[in-house]
A protein has these predicted regions:
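Flexible glycine/proline-rich, aromatic-decorated loop/lid segments
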Residues: 425-428, 432, 440-459, 495-528
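Conserved phosphate-handling catalytic cores of large alpha/beta enzymes
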Residues: 438-447, 459-492, 497-501
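Cofactor-binding active-site loop characterized by glycine-rich and histidine/acidic residues
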Residues: 296-459, 463
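Active-site pocket-lining segments that scaffold enzyme catalytic pockets across diverse folds
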Residues: 256, 260-320
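Subset of Sec-pathway N-terminal targeting signals
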Residues: 42-43, 48-89, 93-96
């Protein structure tokens, strides 16, 4: 009904009750125009009986309402007698509104038979869900601090514990571990998950052999990609039996060359790779995966540590030529520089594809070769008209002390995304043997938590990886190649390992680091650690692992190339 008001028993009542308006009309038509007060139930019941028999009741109600709505719109549109009746109704300051649109709305709603869901939110459940999301983010931000990264577990250069990674820190109890939460695909592409299962999965993902630092990356697409890449694997990359045997073969080569040189040329400087042997399968996996991504040319820059191993076991330098250099037999075409500064070029076969490899000559000054490599890559990209930066890849290798201590690193990173200097991203590898010459305590070598913290100045993600887990190392290599090719940005791999000998083979590290080296001397080699793992998994037998070592040693005795992927260079690709 329409909206004028009357006072009944001293209460304001709207005209929504037709009995009231009809009673008013009856009073008005009977000459009793006044405000009704004190309407008791006896009179009201009598009125009900009257309303049932009067012309104002029953089906005529709708007719009277329509008349009154017409009167509200245009008083002249109704009969003069009705106009006089409506004019005599009590006046009110409220604006009267027709009821027909309201009735039409409810009729339409009934026809549509629409049911709206009402969500009742439990404040306690909502608060718990917020804490679950905070728990997940704690692992994404700080899980790397509790990752199993140090092969010898000697010096806790990280914080000893991270309280945010404990569910109790977020006010959960042991009873909550069996509670299921709807996380709406926030992690692991799961809708519902028990808190206990979530805690276990997060620990496996972010606190295993890989510690990923990526939450400082501001670009959401890059951050989501990195996050998904690690979480989809639960930090447990899957490798085929053939791939595992190949990884062991490459570790055997890295270990075998160093042992051979140490026995054949004792005391000669070679800046051994021992302890960081996983560097060799890391580099070869980068080449293989880059080739699958369309890379045709890779330029490397590195210092002295592990360089001889890189020359023989990756680029395919003949061991015989290296032995001649140790013996002092220098070619007249050479510069006369030391053997661990020499450059090299070769072709590397990946299936039916070839990748041209170049190792830049290294000046003795640490890190100076990095901008040289970037310039060489940029010029090759220009020569190939490689405007998308897909065909030529830069890979630079650093030491843990040098990457944190040399100013040229910052200068090179600063130019990495500048339009005139960018090469579409560089893969930067740190051979982190946790010691700089004779200093291992990070409180004495740097002011940052990690040696790679400088990477954060350009928001480069950092993959910390345990050097005793070659499968994790290979996964890090693939991840780095894919990230670089997709986003054209720098990415760091922090290969955390150790140095089995002194800074060079003439040094005795027990004199300066007796505690550290008493542990290292008892620690098995990376080859031995992985061989035992594969034997336990049933991938190979102990006899096969030993045979692998013997075959490599025989190849060195013959002086032949030991890289099966080596190919004669295409003359058009020669440097």
């Amino acid at each position: 009904m329409c909206g004028f008001f009357v006072e009944v028993d001293h209460k304001i009542v709207t005209k929504c009750d037709l009995r009231i308006i009809s009673f008013f009309i009856l009073c008005i038509m009977g000459g009793q125009h006044h405000v009704i007060q004190g309407v008791d139930m006896q009179h009201y019941n009598a009125f009900d009986e009257w309303l049932a028999s009067t012309a104002l009741g029953g089906s005529n109600q709708s007719y009277i309402e329509e008349l009154y709505e017409s009167y509200l719109e245009d008083p002249s549109s109704v009969d003069e007698s009705w106009r006089a009746t409506f004019d005599a109704l009590p006046k009110t300051t409220a604006v009267e509104q027709p009821h027909s649109p309201v009735r039409d709305y409810f009729r339409r709603l009934a026809r549509e038979n629409t049911t709206e869901a009402v969500t009742v939110i439990d404040p306690e459940a909502s608060a718990k869900l917020v804490k679950v999301l905070q728990f997940i983010n704690a692992y994404r931000f700080r899980g790397h601090l509790e990752a199993k990264l140090d092969p010898i577990n000697y010096y806790r250069w990280k914080v000893s514990s991270v309280p945010e990674l404990d569910y109790r820190y977020h006010s959960f109890t042991e009873q909550d571990l069996n509670e299921t939460f709807n996380i709406n695909h926030y992690v692991y592409h799961r809708d519902n998950i028990k808190l206990g299962d979530l805690a276990e999965m997060l620990k496996e993902t972010y606190c295993g052999s890989i510690g990923l630092e990526f939450m400082h990356v501001q670009d959401m697409e890059q951050k989501s990609w990195l996050q998904s890449k690690l979480e989809s694997q639960l930090n447990k990359p899957l490798f085929t039996k053939e791939e595992k045997i190949n990884l062991l073969s490459e570790l055997t080569a890295a270990d075998g060359l160093e042992r051979y040189l140490g026995a054949k040329f004792p005391g000669a400087k070679r800046f051994s790779l021992e302890g960081s042997d996983a560097f060799i399968p890391l580099m070869k996996e980068i080449i293989r995966h880059a080739s699958k991504q369309g890379v045709q040319d890779v330029v490397f820059g590195m210092a002295h540590r592990g360089r001889l191993n890189m020359l023989v076991n990756v680029l395919g330098k003949k061991p015989e030529d290296l032995f001649d250099e140790f013996a002092g037999k220098h070619s007249g075409e050479r510069t006369g520089d030391v053997k661990y500064h020499q450059g090299f070029s070769s072709d590397f076969a990946v299936g039916d594809r070839r990748v041209h490899l170049t190792l830049a000559f290294n000046p003795s000054h640490l890190e100076i070769v990095s901008p040289v490599v970037i310039g060489a890559v940029r010029s090759r990209q220009t020569k190939k008209n490689d405007t998308e930066r897909n065909q030529v890849l830069a890979v630079t290798v650093h030491g843990d002390s040098a990457v944190a201590g040399q100013g040229v690193v910052q200068e090179t990173l600063n130019m990495s995304n500048a339009r005139g200097y960018t090469v579409g991203g560089t893969i930067r590898i740190v051979i982190n043997n946790q010691i700089g010459f004779t200093t291992s305590n990070p409180n004495d070598t740097r002011s940052t938590e990690y040696c790679t913290d400088i990477a954060k100045m350009i928001q480069a993600p950092i993959i910390h990886v345990n050097g005793d887990d070659p499968e994790a190392v290979a996964f890090a290599a693939r991840m780095a190649v894919e990230y670089r090719n997709l986003f054209k940005r720098d990415i760091f791999i922090d290969l955390i390992s150790y140095r089995r000998h002194g800074h060079n083979e003439a040094d005795e590290p027990l004199a300066t680091q007796p505690m550290m080296y008493s542990i290292i001397k008892k620690h098995p080699t990376p080859r031995k650690v992985y061989a035992d793992r594969l034997i336990a998994e049933g991938v190979i037998t102990e006899e096969e692992a030993i045979e692998m070592m013997n075959l490599y040693r025989d190849a060195l005795d013959n002086g032949d190339r030991v890289v099966k992927e080596w190919r004669e260079m295409d003359i058009a690709q020669m440097d």
